[in-house]
Amino acid sequence: MNYTGKKILVLGMGKTGISMVKWLSRLGAQLSVADTRTSPPNLELISRIVPGEAIFCGPLKEELFQGIDAIAISPGVAVAEPLVQAALQQGVPVIGDIELFAVALDQYAPPGTKILAITGSNGKTTVTSMVGEMVKNAGWDVEVAGNIGPAALDALMQRMDANKWPHLWALELSSFQLETTSSLRPDAATVLNLSEDHLDRYDSIEEYAAAKARIFSRPHNNGCVQILNRDDARVYAMADKNSKQVTFGLSAPVSDEEFGLLPGGSDVWLAQGSTHLLKTSELAVAGLHNAANALAALALCRAVDLPFEPLLHALRTFRGLPHRMQKVAEFNGVTFYDDSKSTNIGSAVAALNGFRKNVILIAGGDGKGQDFSPLEQPVSKHVRSVVLLGRDADKVAQAIQASNVPIHRVTTMDEAVQVSFLLAEHGDVVLLSPACASLDMFNNYIHRAEVFTAAVRLIERKFVLTAQTCH
């Protein structure tokens, strides 16, 4: 679509919404912008681009959708919104920022520009960051963008203005972004895993999986290499007979192209086929789930023919991301980890399975309609006690009851940390891995992590002070 003079309704004024406003205004579109919040972010910035009479805050109204040529929808706004559905039925296109980005790349990017696209319930930000570091270490100019930030269109405009195109785009994509994307042509793409998530937005996990699988729906040709997790049946079922597949998993590779784990000496190695590549003990990030992340990142980078040596060097030095299995403190023989980014079951299960020690688990929050029963087995295997807080604490407790692990209820994060420290024995881990969203008690998962860390630091100071007094 040529957007010059076209009437486009942009829904949402968050980071993605403002990026679409800026991009579409460059293309000469006639914009109106709406957000269901009465005081949305970026209102002042948008009012500099869009006339005040074309900006609407509060519940969406039918008249907003009259006479428009397209809807540019932010990931935070559901396509299932009745007024959006009514517009779709009338033939109005509904697009998102990644669709606009994909069309722009086709038009403006130099030939040979590569795209690696990453999605999944858990680990997608980590893998996207890994890929960025690995590609950079291999000597290519890389732009990491999408759900990870910056917004893809913001990164695109910055690159265009500087006339400095990257060799490769590493894109983290959410299911919400993929729903409205049909023109993206990645050279390789992965769905890392699937676990129950966002079931407040999807009717079933099958519908959620179908949204994720759109990452492989490359138009015009089947040149996208599918990087598939063979340990996840729903992901493995996404294999397309017209595309090339490379699998990764925690089992030994069966073919020369597959990535997996192999024993070697007293260690376990990342491997491709029968070739030992890197000891898992050399990874700076802990846990088997991070070994799987590293294997996926290797498979993606090798799909665009980058050499192994700089990729492996980057993996040795990659230190992980904030609030994802991040060590906060260690005192009195107890280690505290912040995994506040764990907003669903799958990420909490992965975190627990990554530990060989006894864990005091802090969990709970807004469960987003998830079935918590998959927590029962890892809790039974790895957890000494569970400390629960938040709106859906009772649902979590019910799901893990059969594990016979003691459950303690608290009302604040401070109390959760205090109780956990009292329960912990020498050599134990206190792990904040909530398996839930944070908005029932906190501004976001970062705020939840900050409150957790502050509570840990307070106990640490008291402990150190007491120890000094005793001496």
Curated annotation (Swiss-Prot):
Pfam families: Mur_ligase_C, Mur_ligase_M, MurD-like_N. Its EC number is 6.3.2.9. It is found in: Cytoplasm. SUPFAM superfamilies: MurCD N-terminal domain, MurD-like peptide ligases, catalytic domain, MurD-like peptide ligases, peptide-binding domain. It comes from the Bacteria. HAMAP family: MurD. This is UDP-N-acetylmuramoylalanine--D-glutamate ligase. It comes from Nitrosomonas europaea (strain ATCC 19718 / CIP 103999 / KCTC 2705 / NBRC 14298).
